[in-house]
């Protein structure tokens, strides 16, 4: 036998490696298993004919084909109406009694993907809590009277005494440990700090569509058997089929919570009666759902909601009107990950997009056919100014009073822009300051987003080195709050110096300036 060439040896090595990989993945029998379960019989291949003559006597084969041992009712020609009755068992047992061919798992998956439609009571979706107890838990929030991180110590020495540094020397909440505060089941994608000041309420949503409500206990645990068994007061309910994108409260009624999702739906939750209403399902002209990436209530009209989508669309609608009409506008050809309204000029919005741009828009002016877009489906708005980033822009946020716009993205930077005066804005936006910051996440961590505090010119952002960093609008760092894991999704309390961050396992880190808490050990 002639010796193999180098090419042939390499080919044999590749074949062997691929076969080993298939064995490890257990894929060798998948195709035949699928055909078998579907009731499709693969015809046996006829052997290749030989040149020699064969004898005329042939073995007679059985005419009856071999039937699969497992077949669904559909393949047996039976109707679903033939079922005599439903067994008297609970839901979990009923799901486990599915057909023997594994269709019960598909049925369960279909149920999980079924969105909540219409108006519902949360108590109907939460079977392990009494309705009266739930109402009692949240009724205290039913009132409308709320009208470079890693080297912080060295930075602090260089900056000297900066106003606000002591103010944001916050303490980690320690009544319960962070690993005990599992507010959702999956990776947190949105958090919200309710504006109530007498009692803390933190709301979070995860990537599966579950929403968690945490009534924060401020009183220390006593050395008693009852308190040793105490757990964080958390209520969870599944309202969506995909990521919870944004959580907010209605400006005119803070007992009413607004929730949006990547599945295109917007829902409200009334804390006084735990009624959840369907506000809107955002769809295009083809009746396809448009995932909602971000939203914010208008400063000029608190009943009007501005929102952006995963496909680059933008619209506004009146939340008081059910089935409200809306007109879609195109602001990007790719996902808009973040949107913010300018508090000094409420007709201006900023967007950060996967197309690697930060853009400022004037929503008063319409552009019928935007030259920058490859689509011709919707009109757009007038572009005031643009900043081109090296990589995608993850977040945009305006300071409340001094005209600073912050953005961060996958290029590991935080950029600050002076947008106080419209007259000084050029078509090409230039940052007044760039801060190096470790904020590039991977697949298993939610995107880090800088957020200005609603009542102060300070912003916070999570750090991939497991911390929350706080800066003022001049770029001076005020605090570095260390955590055990990455608190990727942060939310400020709008009036108090409290901040919360959610991680990839559904847990919350809470920092406050309460005197009763004990500082985290260095």
Swiss-Prot record:
UniProt GO molecular function: DNA binding
Induction pattern: Closely coexpressed with replication factor A (RF-A), the cohesion complex and the DNA polymerases alpha, delta and epsilon.
Localization of this protein: Cytoplasm; Nucleus
Modified residues (Phosphoserine): 64, 224
Coiled coil regions, renumbered to chain: none
Residue stretches of biased makeup (Polar residues): 54-63
Single GO biological process annotation from the record: regulation of DNA damage checkpoint
Bias (Basic and acidic residues): 75-84
GO annotation, cellular component aspect: chromatin; cytoplasm; nuclear periphery; nucleus
Function (record text): DNA-binding protein that binds to both single- and double-stranded DNA. Binds preferentially to UV-damaged DNA in vitro. May be involved in DNA-metabolic processes.
Extra remark beyond the main annotation: Present with 3810 molecules/cell in log phase SD medium.
Record-given protein name: DNA damage-binding protein CMR1
Naturally occurring in which organism (per UniProt): Saccharomyces cerevisiae (strain ATCC 204508 / S288c)
Source lineage: Eukaryota, Fungi, Dikarya, Ascomycota, Saccharomycotina
């Amino acid at each position: 036998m002639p010796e193999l060439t180098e090419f042939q040896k390499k080919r044999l090595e590749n074949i062997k490696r691929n076969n080993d990989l298939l064995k490890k993945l257990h894929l060798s029998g998948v195709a035949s298993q699928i055909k078998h379960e579907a009731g499709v019989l693969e015809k046996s291949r006829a052997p290749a004919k030989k040149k020699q003559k064969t004898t005329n006597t042939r073995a007679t084969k059985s005419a009856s084909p071999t039937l699969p041992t497992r077949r669904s009712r559909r393949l047996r020609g039976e109707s679903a109406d033939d079922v005599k009755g439903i067994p008297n068992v609970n839901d979990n047992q009923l799901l486990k009694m599915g057909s023997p061919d594994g269709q019960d798992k598909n049925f369960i998956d279909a149920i999980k993907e079924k969105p909540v439609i219409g108006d519902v009571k949360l108590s109907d979706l939460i079977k392990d809590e009494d309705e009266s107890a739930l109402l009692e838990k949240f009724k205290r929030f039913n009132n409308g009277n709320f009208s470079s991180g890693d080297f912080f110590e060295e930075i602090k020495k260089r900056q000297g005494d900066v106003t606000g540094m002591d103010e944001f020397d916050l303490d980690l909440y320690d009544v319960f440990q962070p690993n005990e505060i599992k507010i959702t089941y999956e990776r947190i994608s949105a958090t919200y700090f309710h504006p109530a000041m007498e009692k803390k309420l933190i709301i979070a949503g995860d990537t599966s569509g579950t929403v968690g409500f945490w009534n924060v206990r401020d009183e220390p645990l006593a050395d008693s058997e009852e308190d040793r068994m105490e757990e964080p007061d958390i209520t969870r309910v599944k309202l969506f089929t995909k990521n919870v994108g944004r959580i907010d409260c209605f400006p005119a009624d803070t007992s009413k919570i607004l929730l949006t999702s990547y599945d295109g739906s917007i829902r409200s939750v009334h804390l006084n009666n735990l009624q959840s209403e369907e506000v809107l399902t955002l769809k295009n002209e083809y009746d396809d759902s448009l995932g909602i990436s971000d939203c914010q209530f208008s400063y000029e009209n608190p009943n009007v909601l501005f929102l952006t989508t995963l496909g680059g669309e933008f619209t506004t609608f009146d939340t008081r009107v059910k089935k409200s009409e809306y007109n879609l506008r195109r602001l990007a050809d790719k996902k808009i990950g973040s949107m913010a309204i300018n508090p000094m000029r409420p007709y201006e919005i900023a967007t950060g997009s996967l197309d690697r741009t930060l853009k400022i828009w004037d929503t008063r002016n319409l552009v019928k056919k935007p030259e920058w877009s490859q689509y011709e489906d919707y009109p757009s708005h007038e572009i005031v100014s643009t900043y081109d980033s090296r990589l995608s822009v993850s977040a945009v946020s305006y300071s409340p009073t001094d005209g600073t716009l912050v953005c961060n993205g996958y290029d590991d930077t935080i950029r600050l822009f002076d947008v106080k005066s419209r007259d000084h804005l050029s078509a090409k936006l230039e940052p007044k300051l760039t801060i190096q910051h470790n904020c590039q996440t991977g697949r298993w961590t939610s995107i880090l987003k800088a957020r200005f505090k609603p009542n102060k010119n300070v912003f916070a952002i999570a750090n991939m080195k497991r911390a929350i960093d706080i800066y003022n609008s001049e770029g001076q760092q005020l605090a570095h709050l260390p955590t055990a894991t990455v608190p990727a999704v942060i939310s400020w309390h709008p009036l108090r110096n409290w901040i919360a961050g959610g991680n990839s396992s559904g847990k919350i880190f809470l920092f406050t300036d309460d005197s009763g808490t004990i500082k985290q050990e260095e």
